[in-house]
């Protein structure tokens, strides 16, 4: 863990051992897995689709004593942490949290000794309890426990030490631990989204680079809107963002460092450059550049230097995206007469078309799991869909009037995109899971477009 948030051995409660307990891997399939003692452990199987979300209780987290911190009292933070955890789990579409106000007030000793009979009568199948404690050095400790109500047993416990200002990160980490333990899937709640904030009339939009947590919290603007910005993309290190900006009315690719606010020009050429994206190792940026009326895909070291041309077709080649291992690139091209999806080796060799459905395809993005490619489907509207890397198994996930610009969550189970309203023209950020059932609006202060979902934070 980083210095911002670190795991903590839960020694604050006498019933807990001095080392953190890590959950066992769930069984490969089924609603539950048999353990050595023949008790059945809860499991949410998300591969076959969810007919009924799991009832789960996340009561207010108690504190040994209410202490004032820079982020409020620990008593207030206990309520807020529980609320964030509950909202995270609900947003996945896999869980139905009980209404917090209707739940039993958990005392501090009860954190490690749940009243199973009460929680069983409440209808909850799983229980998330914890605590918030102020430390002498000004930090907070947030404890996180998951219990199987039916089996009356603990499934995991973890703890996180954070600065008071970072209490939401501890909540997201707890939700991630619960999600992973119950589904077997990787976490994604403790992550951020960078996007384009928009305001103003259609013919004179003010566009600013902005960043926020994946749930819309901790929002801040990164640019002032003096120059138009487009297509931000996170680096694998979570510390930098590449994007297109019209400084001096000339589109150029830049890299923005989140910690310092430093901005650096990547490709210093008079040609139009756009659609940048980092390689998985963060050492290369792949992008499109127009030369003599022809648009092809190039790559350049992040530090700058000579750009290498990867495609040479007479059409428009753009929107490149690396495979997770960096060996291949998916991109869109109209070389066949309409926008379609192609895959090539990272050096530009072996270019092959993979999309053959009706309509046109744009903005392909490789899943971090490596198994799917998300895209925008154009035909009777704009829709977000996925296909396998050989082009088979195409599935349309959204049915809005204009849904586009997909970006994968860190675990490859959820896709962020932006939606344009038919009548008003307003743009909003949304997410959808791979079933296409669980759509979620991502709140932003103003209109939003071009989301880029960053990697999981350390």
UniProtKB/Swiss-Prot annotation:
Q: How does it assemble?
A: The Tol-Pal system is composed of five core proteins: the inner membrane proteins TolA, TolQ and TolR, the periplasmic protein TolB and the outer membrane protein Pal. They form a network linking the inner and outer membranes and the peptidoglycan layer.
Gene name tied to this protein: tolB
Q: Which InterPro entries match?
A: 6-blade_b-propeller_TolB-like, PD40, Tol-Pal_TolB, TolB_N
Q: Which GO terms describe its biological process?
A: cell division; protein import
What single Pfam family name could you report for this chain, choosing any that match?
Answer: TolB_N
State the UniProt keywords alphabetically.
Cell cycle, Cell division, Periplasm, Signal
Which subcellular locations apply to this protein? Periplasm
* Residues of the signal peptide: 1-23
Q: Which GO terms describe its cellular component?
A: periplasmic space
Q: Which family does it belong to?
A: Belongs to the TolB family.
Protein name as catalogued:
Tol-Pal system protein TolB
The primary location reported for this protein is periplasm
Q: Which organism is it from?
A: Zymomonas mobilis subsp. mobilis (strain ATCC 31821 / ZM4 / CP4)
Q: Domain of life of the organism in this record? A: Bacteria
Keyword Repressor applies: no
What's the stated role of this polypeptide? Answer: Part of the Tol-Pal system, which plays a role in outer membrane invagination during cell division and is important for maintaining outer membrane integrity.
């Amino acid at each position: 863990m980083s210095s911002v948030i670190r795991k903590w051995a839960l020694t604050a409660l006498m019933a807990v051992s001095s080392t953190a307990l890590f959950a066992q891997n769930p069984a490969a399939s089924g609603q539950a897995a048999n353990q050595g003692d023949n008790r059945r452990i809860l499991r949410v199987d998300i591969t076959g689709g969810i007919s009924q979300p799991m009832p789960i209780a996340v009561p207010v987290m108690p504190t040994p004593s209410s202490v004032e911190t820079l982020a409020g009292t620990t008593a207030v933070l206990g309520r807020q942490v529980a609320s964030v955890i509950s909202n995270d789990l609900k947003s996945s579409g896999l869980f139905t949290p009980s209404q917090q106000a209707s739940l039993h007030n958990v005392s501090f000793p009860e954190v490690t000794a749940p009243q199973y009979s009460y929680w069983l009568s409440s209808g909850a199948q799983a229980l998330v309890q914890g605590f918030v404690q102020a430390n002498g050095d000004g930090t907070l400790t947030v404890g996180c426990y998951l219990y199987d109500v039916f089996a009356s047993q603990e499934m995991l416990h973890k703890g996180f030490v954070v600065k008071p200002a970072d209490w939401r990160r501890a909540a997201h980490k707890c939700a991630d631990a619960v999600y992973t333990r119950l589904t077997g899937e990787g976490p994604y709640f403790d992550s951020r989204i960078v996007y384009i904030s928009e305001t103003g009339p259609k013919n004179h939009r003010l566009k600013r680079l902005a960043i926020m947590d994946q749930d819309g919290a901790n929002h801040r603007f990164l640019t002032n809107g003096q120059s138009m910005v487009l297509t931000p993309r996170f680096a694998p290190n979570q510390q930098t963002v590449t994007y297109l900006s019209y400084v001096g009315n000339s589109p150029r690719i830049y890299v923005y460092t989140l910690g310092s606010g430093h901005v650096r020009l990547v490709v210093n050429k008079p040609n139009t450059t756009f659609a940048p994206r980092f390689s998985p190792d963060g050492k290369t940026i792949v992008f499109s550049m127009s030369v003599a009326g022809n648009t092809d895909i190039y790559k350049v070291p992040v530090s700058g230097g000579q750009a290498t041309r990867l495609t040479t077709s007479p059409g428009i080649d753009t929107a490149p995206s690396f495979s997770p291992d960096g060996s291949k690139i998916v991109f869109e091209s109209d070389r066949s007469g309409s926008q379609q999806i192609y895959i090539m080796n990272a050096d530009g060799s072996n270019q092959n078309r993979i999309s053959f459905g009706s309509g046109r395809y744009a903005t392909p993005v490789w899943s971090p799991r490596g198994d799917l490619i998300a895209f925008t489907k154009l035909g009777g509207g704009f829709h977000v869909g996925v296909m396998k890397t050989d082009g088979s198994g195409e599935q349309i996930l959204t049915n809005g009037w204009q849904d586009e610009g997909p970006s994968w969550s860190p675990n490859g189970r959820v896709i962020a995109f932006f939606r344009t309203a038919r009548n008003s023209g307003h743009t909003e950020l949304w997410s959808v899971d791979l079933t296409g059932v669980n759509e979620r609006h991502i709140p932003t202060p103003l209109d939003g477009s071009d989301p880029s979902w960053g990697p999981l934070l350390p």
